[in-house]
Amino acid sequence: MKKLLFTIAISGILAITTAFTSPTVSKLVSKAGHINFFSHTAIEDISADNFKVVSTLNTATGEVVYSVPMQSFEFEKALMQKHYNSKKFLDTKTYPKAKFKGQITNLDAVNFEVDGTYNVTIAGEMNLHGVTKVITETATITVLGNKITVETKMNLTLADYKVAFKGGKPSTNIAKTIEVTSKSEYTKEG
């Protein structure tokens, strides 16, 4: 009987100790993610950066969510920024945020507790300019110590989201498909 009580007591202590020492936080937040978009045409290259991207990564479920403040993209030229934000293009006053909510489809390929680089596929819904599309993209997750970095590069066809200049110089200066790169860093607690 004493052995049984001793075993139960030790099991309880181990369970409590494990509960308080194991990393239980599975939802991580990045408040300063970076997104760059790049457009190449024969006339000019256009690039813009946004360092105010907020995202979450749930390491237990594989859910990823991104919120992108569209007016926070910074351009080399003020006129580019004006065209980008205008009602004739992205209309960022009406559509102030782009959002993505998705899932890592091969979560079992990632060990968030072991340093390494993992190739994953993320599928979900992208909402941009009031249009929601289902997309599937590849990404790289790097685990190094208590840091987790998620990076992806994809091509985005503007017409899919009803984004286009109807005519004039801006319509010939921006590519129909742009390259979008994203990098978000998360810190594990503990």
Which residues are covered by each model-predicted region?
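Positively charged n-region of N-terminal signal peptides that target proteins for export
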Residues: M1-L5
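Short amphipathic alpha-helical "recognition" segments used for binding
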Residues: F6-T7, N85
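Bacterial N-terminal signal peptides
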Residues: I8-T17
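Low-complexity, acidic/polar, glycine-enriched regions of mature
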Residues: F20-G190
